[in-house]
C-alpha cells in the first residue's frame, strides 16, 4: 500500500513586476509587451528581418537601440518606419534590447547572462492585451 506523494509544483521565474497601484514606466511596459509578443511568435529581430517585415506592412511597432554604432542602419530603419507609418520607440542600450528579445541565456537564479546585443526589433503581433500594451500605445499616440 505505497502511496505516491504529489510532485512539488515549481512556479516559473518571471521578471519583477511592479506593485499594483504603482504606475508602470515605459521601459517596463515595453519589456512586458516584448515578452508577450515573443510568446505569440510576433517578434522580429535584426535589420534584415525587420526591414522585410516593415516593407510587407506587417509591423506594428519598431524598437531601435540608441547606442547603435552604424549611422546607415539607424537612417534606414527611421526612413522605413516613416515611409510605412510604423511607430518607432528608442531604448538606450542594445544589450537591454537583446535581453528583452530573449537573445541570452538564463541561469538557475533567473538572471540573464551571455546577453547578445540587438539594435532593432519589430513587433508584428502584440499577443494578448495587457497594461503594458496600453501604456506603450498611449506613448506612441502622444508622439
From Swiss-Prot:
Disulfide bonds: none annotated. It comes from the Eukaryota. Signal peptide: none annotated. Keywords: Ribonucleoprotein, Ribosomal protein. The keyword Ligase does not apply. It holds the Pfam family Ribosomal_L7Ae. The keyword Metal-binding does not apply. GO terms for molecular function: structural constituent of ribosome. GO terms for biological process: translation. GO terms for cellular component: ribonucleoprotein complex; ribosome. Belongs to the eukaryotic ribosomal protein eS12 family. This is Small ribosomal subunit protein eS12. The gene is RPS12.
